[in-house]
């Protein structure tokens, strides 16, 4: 099956510089049906990366500054921000290098460029894997805090959290090396897809279980205070909306990229599959959008973190 170069497309982030041509353009040839290819302008791509870079840098700086935020939960959030930060940095760096090379402003030997590209490729792949892992870790941490509240501090200790974080980083680096080495194997692509599906199922099961438990708890309190059903229903709708945002953002931002990999592995020669695969840069831009949204969902909802963020911003002025 001709999958050579497919994983390089994943870890290579932008194998060619996004053009500033019209955002929607039909891609046609004599053998393929008309396709709708979405072009991401290079300026927009770089802006998204820079916004994510600034946002996640602030999260890491705030958590590092405030000792009250050095709990296991915030350690996982900090590592998620660091992973998203690396995703943004590596993609912005690769795009900038490609632009400089095309403009002739950067002169380097082919071997040096190749080695630099390999390093950036591995950084992109490892940061994506670690980002998915820490999203799962945050879901598990919240699950334990709800269902094992009395034993939470004995189960999720800072030492265990640090060991788990170290294991995630080591596993991410090793997996990126393996994926990059065996990029021409269909199995490598399918492993990535299975890993994404496993994280999606894990998060869905944990958050749905947490929502049902919270709804039951709210109903119990309502009965105790003899409240009416609209209050219970309103709380349930709020919880369902939160769950929809958590899983919806995860699926919408990460799903297209892994659909891209699945189609490359399953139907690389099919015209319809080829039409979808051509939108790789759009899928990559969605990953960077996820890196922008993650701090809003997981970090900035904390009152303590927002308070420290204000102090950091005021001090910087």
Swiss-Prot record:
Where found, per UniProt?
Answer: Cell membrane
Provide the transmembrane region boundaries.
Answer: 38-63, 73-93, 119-140, 164-183, 192-211, 241-266, 280-300
Q: How does it sit in the membrane?
A: Multi-pass membrane protein
**A GO BP entry:** adenylate cyclase-activating G protein-coupled receptor signaling pathway
Which residues does the annotation flag as glycosylated?
Answer: 29
Q: Name one Pfam family in it.
A: 7tm_1
What Gene Ontology cellular-component terms does the record carry?
A: plasma membrane
- Topology Extracellular: residue spans: 1-37, 94-118, 184-191, 267-279
User: Which SMART domains does the entry link to?
Assistant: 7TM_GPCR_Srsx (SM01381)
Keyword list, A-Z? Cell membrane, G-protein coupled receptor, Glycoprotein, Membrane, Receptor, Transducer, Transmembrane, Transmembrane helix
Q: Name one GO molecular function term.
A: melanocyte-stimulating hormone receptor activity
User: Which residues point to the Cytoplasmic side?
Assistant: 64-72, 141-163, 212-240, 301-317
Query: Tell me, what does this protein do in biology?
Result: Receptor for MSH (alpha, beta and gamma) and ACTH. The activity of this receptor is mediated by G proteins which activate adenylate cyclase. Mediates melanogenesis, the production of eumelanin (black/brown) and phaeomelanin (red/yellow), via regulation of cAMP signaling in melanocytes.
Q: Which family does it belong to?
A: Belongs to the G-protein coupled receptor 1 family.
Q: How does it assemble?
A: Interacts with MGRN1, but does not undergo MGRN1-mediated ubiquitination; this interaction competes with GNAS-binding and thus inhibits agonist-induced cAMP production. Interacts with OPN3; the interaction results in a decrease in MC1R-mediated cAMP signaling and ultimately a decrease in melanin production in melanocytes.
Database matches in PANTHER family:
G-PROTEIN COUPLED RECEPTOR
Protein name per Swiss-Prot or TrEMBL: Melanocyte-stimulating hormone receptor
Gene it is expressed from: MC1R
């Amino acid at each position: 099956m001709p999958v050579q170069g497919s994983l390089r497309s994943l870890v290579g982030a932008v194998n060619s510089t996004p053009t500033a041509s019209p955002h929607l353009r039909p891609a046609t040839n004599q053998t393929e049906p008309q396709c709708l290819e979405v072009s991401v302008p290079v300026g927009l791509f770089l802006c998204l990366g820079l916004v994510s870079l600034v946002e996640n840098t602030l999260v890491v700086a705030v958590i590092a500054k405030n000792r009250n935020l050095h709990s296991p939960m915030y350690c996982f959030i900090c590592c998620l921000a660091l992973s998203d930060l690396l995703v943004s940095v590596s993609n912005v760096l690769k795009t900038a290098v490609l632009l400089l090379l095309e403009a002739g402003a950067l002169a380097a030997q082919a071997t040096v460029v190749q080695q630099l590209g390999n390093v950036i490729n591995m950084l992109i792949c490892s940061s994506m894997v670690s980002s998915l892992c820490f999203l799962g870790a945050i879901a598990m941490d919240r699950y334990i805090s709800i269902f094992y509240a009395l034993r939470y501090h004995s189960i999720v200790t800072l030492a265990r959290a640090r060991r788990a974080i170290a294991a995630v980083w080591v596993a991410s680096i090793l997996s990126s090396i393996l994926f990059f080495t065996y990029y021409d194997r269909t199995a490598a692509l399918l492993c990535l897809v299975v890993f994404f599906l496993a994280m999606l199922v894990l998060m869905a099961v944990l958050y749905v279980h947490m929502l049902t438990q919270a709804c039951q708890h709210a109903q119990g309190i309502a009965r105790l205070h003899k409240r009416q059903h609209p209050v219970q229903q309103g709380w349930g709708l709020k919880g369902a909306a939160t769950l929809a945002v958590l899983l919806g953002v995860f699926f919408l931002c990460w799903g297209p990229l892994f659909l891209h990999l699945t189609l490359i592995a399953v139907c690389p020669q099919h015209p319809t599959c080829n039409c979808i695969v051509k939108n790789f840069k759009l899928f990559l831009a969605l990953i960077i959008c996820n890196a922008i949204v993650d701090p809003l969902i997981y970090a900035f909802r904390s009152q303590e973190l927002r308070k420290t963020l204000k102090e950091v911003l005021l001090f910087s002025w």
